[in-house]
């Protein structure tokens, strides 16, 4: 994989709802229409039962070689813009001031949403 491809940030979650089995991470470019709604990839991170707090580790961009406990739900859509296939695509606007975010969802074993939060990752 391309070590220069960037990676997801480490995310610290607290007060995870009881019954949460997975955390769904939907990475989005809020500015560029073609990469909204998970355009930078959707990842699932599996938790042990009744986890209250977790540090979600980073995931390398432009690869499907994911760390333990991660699953690619939807690969990034950057291939239509010349990027290498993979589960996640790091911010890549080239400094145009795009805003990037991640929708964080706690889901139970039946994929019912228990809680959600949107975290703005920054502008690049």
Pin down the residues of each PLM region.
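N-terminus-centered regions that define maturation/targeting leaders and the start
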Residues: 1-124
């Amino acid at each position: 994989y391309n070590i220069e491809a960037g990676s997801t940030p480490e995310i610290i979650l607290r007060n995870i709802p009881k019954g949460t089995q997975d955390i769904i991470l939907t990475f989005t470019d809020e500015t560029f229409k073609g990469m909204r709604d998970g355009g930078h990839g959707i990842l699932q991170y599996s938790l042990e039962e009744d986890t209250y707090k977790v540090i979600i580790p980073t995931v390398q961009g432009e690869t499907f070689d994911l760390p333990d406990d991660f699953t690619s739900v939807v690969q990034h859509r950057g291939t239509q813009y010349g990027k290498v296939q993979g589960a996640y695509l790091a911010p890549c606007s080239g400094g145009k001031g795009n805003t990037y975010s991640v929708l964080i969802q706690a889901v139970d074993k039946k994929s019912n949403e228990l809680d959600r939060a949107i975290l703005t990752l920054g502008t690049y």
